[in-house]
Amino acid sequence: PDDNLYCTDDGDHTVKKITPEGKLLFQIGVPGNPSEFMSNLPFHRCTHTALCPDNNIFVSDGYGNACVHKYSPDGKLIKTFGEPGSGPGQFNLVHNIVADDDGWIYVADRENHRIQVFNTEGKYEAQWNNLHRPCGLFMPRGKCPVCIIGELGPGMLVNRQYKNLGPRLSIVDNKGELITRLGGEDGPGHRPGQFLAPHGLSADSLGNIYVGEVSYTNWPASFGDDVKPKFLKTLQKLERIIN
């Protein structure tokens, strides 16, 4: 809502607030200096950032921690919530985070195969199930928004060609009820409209969806020792054709 960019760098262990012109406004974290693994201290390979309507900042810290950090608009740590586990408010690779106009926080708890919903104080409220390794999230601004969820496919040799598990996109309402799914019926693929690893999502004012994929990284998990093509798509635009 403040028209700035929040860049979450898991390799550098930082979050940077940047203007559209590229000016650095502030940075959270020390570059190249991660916190201790699973210490719940910021950051150890942070994964994503969400901005609430009150401009408080929420950062998912999921590759080397299992928690979410809440910051003031000027980057001061307010609180941290979450721990490893599979119960309410616990995480197994917290991978993405979004906020809606009412201030609810939606967290992609990837390896627990769910989205967890929290209030702005970090209190657990609900969870959305029947998902498969939810990885990317996008929620447009406005009342009663939908949520677009990018789901990874199976990551094991024994089930990587299973059908109806993804990789895919799921579009749900703000209660987690499924509206539709795109892709994933026949497992991974690299043709237009198929997915290898939906990792980052966005949408424009016309309802077109943009899907960033970590295709090269994911190829061995999806196709094993098959020869990797020289070119794999890493960004797709899905055009909305129905109002």
Residue ranges and their predicted role:
Residues P1-N243:
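Eukaryotic scaffold repeat domains enriched in small/polar residues
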